[in-house]
Amino acid sequence: MVSRRFAVVLLCSALGGIGCQGRASGATPKEGPMLLAVGAKVPNLTGTDQHGAEHRLADSTGHPLLVYFYPKDATPGCTKDACAFRDVWKRFEQQGVTLYGVSRDDQASHAKFAAKYQLPFPLIADPSGAWEHAFGVPNNNGKSTRVSFLFDARGRLAHVYPKVDPGVHAEQVLGDVARLGSGQ
């Protein structure tokens, strides 16, 4: 009887130790997507903007490309970010940057948002999450996480911005684009 009780205690201890060992190692039951890594090629994606025009990312090589993901049209942070890009749009054009905003909102929502805030760049409708998935952008309750990707003229990912501050993001990207042009 004692040996049987000892065996049960020993078994429970061993099983409990396995569970503790898994937690101690930092393992999580569900890992999120991995963001596209610096050096990766531009994903081969096509999307429709707020005007119904088709855009192929693969056609965007030869000059810098910024793809920025945002959660939802016309929300405070997303509006601030989009308007900051709008306000420095001429500088993006002067540096030859192609810029795409991407969210899961549909084309009609993008059209309304772009018209209201006079956004001069394409907003790609990604209701299926295909772009989000290709870039490894986490999804939070049906909304893309705010993250941006800057590609160089060769179509290689040069910078990932996983923690975007809408108040400074546009200027930060312009600085990085200037450094790309100078080879830094």
Label every PLM stretch briefly.
Residues 19-44:
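N-proximal helix/coil linker or "cap" segments that precede and/or mark the start of modular domains
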Residues 58-79, 85:
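Short active-site neighborhood of thiol/selenol oxidoreductases, capturing the structured segment around
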Residues 42-43, 64, 145-147:
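Short loop/turn microsegments at loop-to-beta-strand junctions
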Residues 8-17:
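Bacterial N-terminal signal peptides
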Residues 144-184:
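Thiol-/selenol-based redox modules, centered on thioredoxin-like
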Residues 79-117, 128-133:
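Structural microenvironment flanking redox-active thiols in thiol-disulfide oxidoreductases
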Residues 45-65:
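A short beta-strand-turn-helix
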Residues 1-8:
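Bacterial N-terminal signal peptides that target proteins for export
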